[in-house]
Amino acid sequence: MAHPAGPELAGRRATRLPYLLLVTRTGLSVAQGAALTLGAVLGTGVISLPALAAAEAGPASLVAWLALIALSVPLATTFASLGARHPDGGGVSTYARLAFGEHVSTMVGWAFYLTIGVGAPVAAGFAGSYVADAVGGGRATNLTATAGIIALVTLLNWFGIRISGRVQLGIAGAIALLLAVSVAVSLPHADLGNLTPFAPHGWSAVGRAASLLVWAFAGWEILTSLSAEYHDPARDIRRSTTIALVVVGVLYLGIAFATVAVLGSDTGPAPLSDLLVLGFGGGARPVTTVVAVLLTLGAVNAYFAGGSRLGAALARDGGMPHVLAAGGGPGEVPRRSLAVIAGIALGTVGTMAASGLSTDATLLLATGTFSFVYVVGAAAALRLLPRGTASWWCAVASLVAALVLLGLTGTHVVGPILFAGAGLAWTVVKRRTSPLPAPVEPARAGSCP
């Protein structure tokens, strides 16, 4: 049976959302939407961030987890409302253009595009630490696995091969089950003595831990791309978002508490593996590694696929060099844009190898960019959403929280600012030499709260 909206629209949507393969004939259901959102948010951050946050703030890192979970409520609501009113694959760049014009749109687009390459080694490095832990390797093994994951994802995208929605959801489901099992089997080993002193590095460390954890909660913006596929966006997005929020909050807080209360000062770089070993023995470690690698492949693949199309779209609209626009049409592969992202990512890994930096060295730069994107998205929402409504007030709360998070990144915010400044400078020079093409306008959905 043909897609109810016609084959052309179905083709365009399939191109915009290659991972969305669970759309029913009548639209995306609440359960499917919740599962896809959960898969986007439960990314690679769950692999190692509990240990990084605990190292930064000790048991007080639990306060940072609670704060980020609370922040997710207005943040997810804001992006869901934007997506329902302005369904388009451009995401925050589209909202920035509608609210503030081409310059801001290009700036946020450049910051996000370039950060995908710089941040990819962080995501791949999380899985690399699990590989090194499983085989008894060290730094060289970690870096090799990190580069291998980036190369494999690049190869998959180069030939247009995409991970299907069902496989990606299966991976997310496996991770959710693994987290729940990890907490359940490790809690009998909890020692409340590990919760004292509660704030060994002072309360200011909670803020630093929170800035790290932004990575774990990146992904709510994917709602803006999924919104056009819901059967009834105004009704169903709220329901699916609520389900995803509850599941994410319970799983993240559970694994964070187990990391602190069970492992204490013995927390290693792969706490999920350590928790399972406590419950099932050494045989559980390889299973965790396989799931971690699969999850990382899915997450990095999604960012590379989306990032390469973002670069091509920006180039098409005059926001990046036109040479990157090749392959950006429906059914095509934006190989030039993909090659730029892959080159940045592998170059970053090479720099880490030569300088002795760890694979999470660019983590705060990446989280700074996510915070920057959220600031722009929330600010755009204040202009695009009906003033005084619940979603508008959520945008207010999101903007305040995102500004705080952006400030907590400290000097690391310089990275996205420089990226954005480069985009602005390029656009100004380009406008002086040749006129910019007219951007493609997104479709306008019906009114929503």
Residue ranges and their predicted role:
Residues 366, 379-449:
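A generic transmembrane alpha-helix motif of multi-pass inner-membrane proteins
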Residues 94-96, 101, 133-134, 242-303, ...:
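TM-loop-TM module centered on a large, flexible mid-protein loop between adjacent transmembrane helices
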Residues 52, 56, 64, 73-150, ...:
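Hydrophobic transmembrane alpha-helices that form the core helical bundles
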Residues 3, 8-51, 56-60, 73, ...:
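Membrane-interface "cap" regions at the ends of multi-pass membrane proteins
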Residues 141-189, 200-201, 241-245, 369-376, ...:
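Membrane-interface loop-to-helix entry segments
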Residues 12, 16-25, 61-62, 66, ...:
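Helix-loop-helix junctions that connect adjacent transmembrane segments
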Residues 320-328, 356-357, 375-390:
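Alpha-helical transmembrane segments
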Residues 46-50, 156-161, 265, 320, ...:
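Transmembrane helix-loop junctions in multi-pass membrane proteins
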